[in-house]
Amino acid sequence: MERRNAWLSYTEAEEKELEQVAKAYRNFLNVGKTERECVTQIIREARAAGYESLEEKTAKGEKLKAGDKVYTVGMKKIIALFHIGQDDISEGMNILGAHIDSPRLDVKQNPLYEDTDLAYLDTHYYGGVKKYQWVTLPLAIHGVVVKKDGSTAEVNIGEDEDDPIVYITDLLIHLAGKQMQKKAAEVIEGENLDILIGSRPLKDLEDDKKKEAVKQNVLNILKEKYDMEEEDFLSAELEIVPAGKARECGLDRSMIAAYGQDDRVCAYTSLLAMLGMDTPKHTSCCLFTDKEEIGSVGATGMQSRFFENAVAELLDAMGCYSDLRLRRTLKNSSMLSSDVSAGYDPAYGEAFEKKNAAYLGRGIVLNKFTGARGKSGSNDANAEYVARVRNIFDSHEVAFQTAELGKVDVGGGGTIAYIAALYGMEVIDSGVAVLSMHAPWEVTSKADVYEAYKAYKAFLLDA
């Protein structure tokens, strides 16, 4: 059942559309390197497509009807879009669910220190990372600083050409004999992922401050640019991410290399499919969650009540809320958990079982189950639902493939699918194959990005 490379089937018109999708996607990656930035961009694009704030419409007492398009946001890190359909919503929604957080380094609450005339920010890594991949790279600082008076300063350092970047050092090879004998997990330890941010001491300091003259200079710069004091780090969310824009990859420009493609490749293609919809038969929903990389925990993760509460508010705004109707709406819904899959890498072929692996360029990937070992932590989609999704994709000429996440007992991973399935709805993982997943720079195929967009659009129309 080997799948054909999707590139071989495209017409000239399809290739043109593919390139347009890929270009728009790269722009999304450039402006959305944190979950907050992604939510901001999603709102911007949704409003341009006619979406309105659910809270604003509710405050005005406006009732929702078929064709209305609304969104609701939680803590600036999670967002749901709804396009009201023609059928009774209790018959179920067609849902696309992606996550917009990605592995990174988070600045600690008390991070700034100086050592031998070098200033550093202490960090704590977020999500599953190979720590050694994060050293000796140009890095940027993104995030917010919230002061005691409630005012917020948005931080973005390292992306403009004139911006400085920050950096994590590594031991020079000439002195690394002992280091090179360590296991990969220990070569760079978590406490050594400290960000080099300065080396110029401030002049004319009082004697008691001369020992930390470089740190004082950094604080002066932060005060001048963001009006922040050192204490304001306590209420800051600063994320260290790779600096630089998404790039076309390969001499044939067939791929995209960028930070955060897990899972923003599925988030953006889901968004694009959602925004291009005419009034659907079934109500469409696009959900973008936070905290997936650390277990979907917290108030902005999928395990929170955000989604359930959002649907309840939607029903109330439609004038048809009841607890039973809410439960029926969720139970009768169909969902694609829009999350990435491990792309087969011939350089590491021993980690994959080739018949059940995802290949770049062969279309969107269906993962009937994920999890680890004996499918632990998995959502295992029903065969009837897999057949229905297959039929939808085939009817719309979507290139797709099926895969597992590597060989049995080699590793594993999870998504938000099993959490959504707790409502009794049908869910299957469906996303794009990625090379070097969770690395600072990941690689996807433009063809797979395009097929994901087509797949999500087909699902919203016909599921």
Write out the residue ranges for each language-model feature.
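N-terminal hydrophobic/helix-forming segments and targeting peptides
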Residues: 1-463
